[in-house]
Amino acid sequence: MNKFIIKVIFILHICSLLSCSYTPIFSEKNYNFGIEKISFDKNGEKDINRIIKNRFNLVQQVNDKQETKYSISVKTTKEREIISKDSKGDPVKFELIVSAIYTVLKNNEIILDRNIERKHIYDNNSDKFKLEQNEKIIIENLSRNISDVILASIVTLDDN
């Protein structure tokens, strides 16, 4: 009898968690604005620009008919610095810094101008292929984070 009660409570708990209708904030594609144009500095980091552009293309396609339209201009940079070295002078830890300076325009008027910087520290790897793959994953994650911050700043602009 005791095991039966525990199982029932467990099942009810799982059912209540699954039915809470949690959705991430950026999965909702019903924003009150549209993205008219996204432009990137030609000297910016191509991989970072591609990731940010792909993330905003989703918003741009869904919200094409909105009255409020914004244009976004982005300049991205990437730096890799050596944080620590071993006794031989070989790098042990790296820091990858991804930054973006972005401007949001509405009717050709600047309404927001900000700088975002995201950092990640990681260990060196003797296998350079794995190190390069790890760096690509880190760059993608930092770039997604930056695009989420840009989108959040536009959402808060539109709420005001």
Predicted regions span which residues?
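Surface-exposed short loop/turn segments
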Residues: N54-V59, N63-D64, S73-E140, R144, ...
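Short extracytoplasmic
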Residues: K42-L58
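Bacterial Sec signal peptide processing site at the extreme N-terminus
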Residues: S16-K37
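Short Gly/Ser/Thr- and Asp/Glu-enriched loop/turn motifs at secondary-structure junctions
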Residues: E67-K69
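Sec-dependent bacterial lipoprotein signal peptides
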Residues: M1-C20
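Short hydrophobic beta-strand segments
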Residues: G34-N43, S71
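Amphipathic, coiled-coil-like alpha-helical scaffolding segments used for oligomerization/assembly
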Residues: L157-N160
